[in-house]
């Protein structure tokens, strides 16, 4: 099932890549495959950590991981997806010619949240999100993990061009 914000983020990143690297999309982003991350280079059920929404591969290595949340803001979900991705070391999928794609030396993890759905008046979710981003960035890199940077963006739906551009700019900067 395709999700509007997922597609908008994928389109922004595809535009920013402009032929540099490969954007791999899950079905919610308009792709055709799930994007499983594993610990190690052998595909097994016990080493599968999670599926993510978008990956950017450059030079045969995963350089950017993107997770998009359209349904709400739960700190356990936000932190859990980040930690599972940080524990993982490879993207493995049968559709790839490589048996496994390792993470690069410096990987950016991006979380995009639909602010139009999770930033309701009277809540402190925006402050909580900034605190989570600040705290995660302060502990990076985690020992044994290639994720060296973390960014969180609240995008106010598919029409928030400035928000989408911020996501694209952060990814472009990380790949420069």
Q: Across the structure, where does each feature detected by a protein language model lie?
A:
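Nuclease catalytic cores
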Residues: 1-10, 14
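Surface-exposed cleft-lining segments at the edges of enzyme active sites
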Residues: 36-41, 67-74
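Structural motif
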Residues: 62-65, 108
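C-terminal helix of von Willebrand factor
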Residues: 158-175
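Active-site metal-binding core of divalent-cation-utilizing nuclease and nuclease-like domains
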Residues: 22-60
């Amino acid at each position: 099932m395709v999700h509007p914000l997922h597609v908008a983020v994928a389109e922004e990143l595809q535009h920013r890549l402009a032929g540099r690297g490969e954007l791999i999309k899950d079905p919610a982003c308009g792709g055709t495959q799930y994007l499983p991350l594993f610990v190690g280079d052998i595909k097994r059920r016990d080493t599968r950590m999670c599926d993510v929404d978008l990956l950017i591969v450059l030079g045969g290595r995963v350089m950017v991981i993107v997770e998009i949340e359209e349904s709400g803001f739960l700190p356990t979900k936000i932190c859990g997806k980040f930690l599972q991705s940080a524990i993982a070391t490879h993207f493995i999928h049968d559709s790839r010619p490589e048996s496994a794609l390792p993470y690069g030396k410096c990987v950016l993890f991006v979380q995009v949240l639909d602010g139009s759905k999770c930033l309701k008046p009277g809540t402190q979710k925006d402050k909580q999100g900034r605190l989570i981003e600040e705290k995660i960035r302060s502990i990076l890199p985690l020992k044994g993990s290639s994720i060296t940077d973390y960014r969180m963006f609240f995008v106010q739906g598919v029409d928030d061009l400035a928000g989408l551009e911020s996501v694209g700019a952060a990814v472009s900067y990380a790949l420069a």
